[in-house]
C-alpha cells in the first residue's frame, strides 16, 4: 500500500514515540521480583516470572534499588504504582536554564540536548509529574522556551540549504522530522534547478 507523501518521507509522532519508548530509563522499584533460593526451596510455586523478552532486569528487581528498564515499561509500572521514575539529569530547572542560556548566547549553534528530549519530557510531565523535584509548570515553561528558540534557529538555518545538504547539528529526532518534509521538498527543487543549469552550460 502506498503511503501518503508526508508519511513516506518522515515518521508520524506516534512512530517517534514508539521508538523512544524503547530507550532505557532508570527507575526506583517499589516491588521485589527477585526470588531468593530460600523462597524457592520453601515454596516451589514461587518460581513465577513476569513475561518479558528480556528478564534480566524485570525479574530481578529489588524494592528501592534503582535499575534500568525500557521507558514504556517504566511508564506502565509507574501507572500501576510499582515504581518511581528517576528523572534524567538534563530535565531539571537548573540544567534547562543552562541549555536555554547557551541557545540564546549562540545563535548559530544548538545545545547538546538528548536526541529524544521533546518526547521524553512530554511523557514524563504527563505521567510522572510527582517524581520531579522542581515544579512541573516551570519545567514545562523552560522546555517550551527551548523549543521556540531552537525552532527559530532551524528556520534561520534553512537559508543555508542547498541542493546537496543542510547541516544543523544537535537537533532532536522530533525537530528533524518536523522540518524534513519542507527541507526535502526545497532540496528537490534546488536540485532540479541545479541540474537544469548544468545541462545548459
Curated annotation (Swiss-Prot):
Indicate the family of this protein: Belongs to the GINS2/PSF2 family.
Q: Which compartments does it reside in?
A: Nucleus
Q: SUPFAM superfamilies attached here?
A: GINS helical bundle-like, PriA/YqbF domain
Q: Which CDD domains match?
A: GINS_A_psf2, GINS_B_Psf2
Tell me, how does this one assemble? Answer: Component of the GINS complex which is a heterotetramer of SLD5, PSF1, PSF2 and PSF3.
Determine the domain of life of the protein's source.
Eukaryota
The protein's UniProt keywords, in alphabetical order, are: Chromosome partition, DNA replication, Nucleus
Principal localisation: nucleus
Q: What is known about what this protein does?
A: The GINS complex plays an essential role in the initiation of DNA replication. Has a role in chromosome segregation.
The molecule here is called: DNA replication complex GINS protein PSF2
Which GO cellular component terms are attached? GINS complex
Pfam annotation, one family: PSF2_N
Q: Mind telling me which InterPro entries this protein's record contains? A: GINS_A, GINS_bundle-like_dom_sf, GINS_Psf2, PSF2_N
Enumerate the Gene Ontology biological process terms. Answer: chromosome segregation; DNA replication; double-strand break repair via break-induced replication
Amino acid at each position: 500500500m502506498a503511503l501518503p507523501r508526508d508519511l513516506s518521507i518522515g515518521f508520524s509522532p506516534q512512530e517517534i514515540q514508539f521508538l523512544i519508548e524503547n530507550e532505557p530509563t532508570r527507575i526506583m522499584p517499589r516491588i521485589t521480583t527477585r526470588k531468593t533460593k530460600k523462597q524457592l526451596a520453601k515454596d516451589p510455586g514461587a518460581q513465577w516470572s513476569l513475561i518479558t523478552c528480556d528478564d534480566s532486569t524485570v525479574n530481578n528487581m529489588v524494592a528501592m534499588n534503582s535499575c534500568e528498564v525500557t521507558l514504556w515499561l517504566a511508564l506502565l509500572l509507574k501507572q500501576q504504582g510499582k515504581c518511581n521514575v528517576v528523572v534524567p539529569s538534563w530535565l531539571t530547572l537548573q540544567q534547562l536554564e543552562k541549555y536555554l542560556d547557551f541557545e540564546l548566547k549562540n545563535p548559530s549553534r544548538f545545545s547538546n540536548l538528548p536526541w529524544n528530549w521533546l518526547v521524553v519530557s512530554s511523557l514524563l510531565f504527563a505521567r510522572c509529574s510527582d517524581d520531579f523535584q522542581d515544579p512541573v509548570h516551570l519545567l514545562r515553561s523552560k522546555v517550551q522556551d527551548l523549543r521556540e528558540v531552537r525552532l527559530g534557529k532551524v528556520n534561520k538555518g534553512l537559508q543555508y540549504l542547498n541542493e546537496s545538504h543542510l547541516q544543523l547539528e544537535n537537533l532532536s529526532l522530533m525537530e528533524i522530522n518536523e522540518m524534513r518534509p519542507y527541507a526535502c521538498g526545497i532540496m528537490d527543487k534546488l536540485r532540479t534547478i541545479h541540474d537544469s543549469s548544468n545541462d545548459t552550460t
